Amino acid sequence: MPVPVLVVGGGSVGLLTAALLTHHGVPAVLVERRSGPSVHPRATGIGPRTVEILRELGLETAVDALAVDLRGAAGKAVARTVVEMGAGDVVTVPMPAPSTDELDVTPFRLRGVCAQDRLDAVVAADLARRGADLRWSTRLVGLAQDADGVDVELEGPDGRYSLRCTRVVAADGTHSTARTALGVGTSGPGDLGKSMINILFRADLRPHLRGMSFATCTITTPEAPGLLATVDGETDWVFHVRCDVDGGERPEDFTHERCAAVVRLAVGDPDLDVEVRSVLSWRPRSAAAESFAVGRVFLVGDAAHTVSPLGAFGLNTGVADAHNLAWKLAAVHHGGAGAGLLDTYAHEREPVAAATLDQAMRRLADPQLHWGRGPEADAARAAAGVWAAPVVHLGQRYDSAAVVDPRPELPSTVDLVLDGSPGSRVPHAWIDGVSTLDLVASRWTLLAGVAGERWLTAAANVGLSAHRVAVPWLPDEGALLVRPDGIVAMRATASATDPARFLTEVLDQVLARPVPVANA
């Protein structure tokens, strides 16, 4: 029997794709060329939508336990060295606390930053507990698809072998083997700036910091300029430095010994005990695949789009890809939807990725637009076409056949507005102590207004979970039909003549039904 879904790549997005498929009851195989989850964090900013998705999987608490509490800390610091920072010679931008408005939008947040390796360890361990088929030290060699499935060639510890799959999700990174095999090109600015060296190291900086904490610190000493990022805020850190390729440097010149010396210069302590754990070379990049789906193969994460780092949009955009795709693959796999539903993945995610790439590039052009606070900064962002970060993370909308009467226009790029419009994430509200986000998680759900008894009866007749809610964004006799990914599929402002028939017709449209007998 073919494997229902093969996930290629075991980074954060690949692992969460496998986790979401497992959550929806779809058997999946994950292959990853490394011997296990990466120990080297490439990101630390887990956004609010990703936290909501982790909560849906039951992993929010475990990830939050590994996050570094930065409440009251500096979001960004600038100092010549760590020693001078601890002595008070530092410029800081405070870590913004969630406003009341933001908490009204999403009550679920991590206490601070959580390095990507910690996230990956939690997800991989959960998959292993669930008996998922995780094949480490295994790489994709090639693939070919036909009308009924995909044949992939893999290379693992025991050599090469073939695998027949119904569908493939490629989460294999910026230089995706799957994307190349499909012949899909990329567009966008491409490589940005200089090559970088990412040094993961362990050293106890607490005596030098003297109680100072931060998410990132720009180190300005001429001997070792770079960006120091918190992993645990005590002994684990990442330091980004430039590789002067124009001056003759090569990434392989950055041995562990040299990297330890660079860290000591940045800290300002020549006798610092440093353990270099890992060294990665990378280059900022901004590009998107020309298509996110080809036949039975779907691109997610960096395989679909590589986002420049300022804004912490890259990882979170990839997780949103996985969340959008997983329930659709599950619906088709279980026979509840036609294969046409899968076409809406690219239709929905490609515009979101394009907008996110644009927003990251605007921040890169003037980083102060990202870090600035207050009315003047808001005005500067508006003038530069820079959206507020919560709008990028939570406010973007879908326009596809999987949404009835979509409203893709953003009400505001300054304030996050979630009003129940079709194509937007369902608004959060507390209903008897339970968030609407929890009420709708992972399943089709009808939310009916306070006078929506006919909607509730109809929902029961067609097999939908349903709840009565008293909220300002839903008329008393109205209803919202919410998809398993928390997106509003339909909004009715009043009762229908035949609510059950109406709901059935909406579901038929969104799910590309009726499903042909031969559908797979």
Q: Where in this protein do the model-derived segments appear?
A:
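Conserved mid-domain beta->alpha element of the FAD-binding
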Residues: 8-18, 23, 54, 123, ...
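Glycine-rich Rossmann-fold phosphate-binding loop(s) that bind the pyrophosphate
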Residues: 9-11, 33, 116
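Glycine-rich FAD pyrophosphate-binding loop
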Residues: 22-43
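Active-site-adjacent segment of FAD-dependent monooxygenases/related oxidoreductases
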Residues: 42, 46-126, 220
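Conserved FAD-binding catalytic core of PHBH/FMO-like flavoproteins
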Residues: 125, 167, 171-284
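A conserved short coil-to-beta-strand element within the FAD-binding core of flavoproteins
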Residues: 136-151
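Core beta-strand elements of the Rossmann-like FAD/NAD(P) dinucleotide-binding domain
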Residues: 158-167
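C-terminal helical "tail/cap" subdomain of flavin- and related membrane-associated enzymes
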Residues: 330-444, 449-457, 461, 490-494, ...
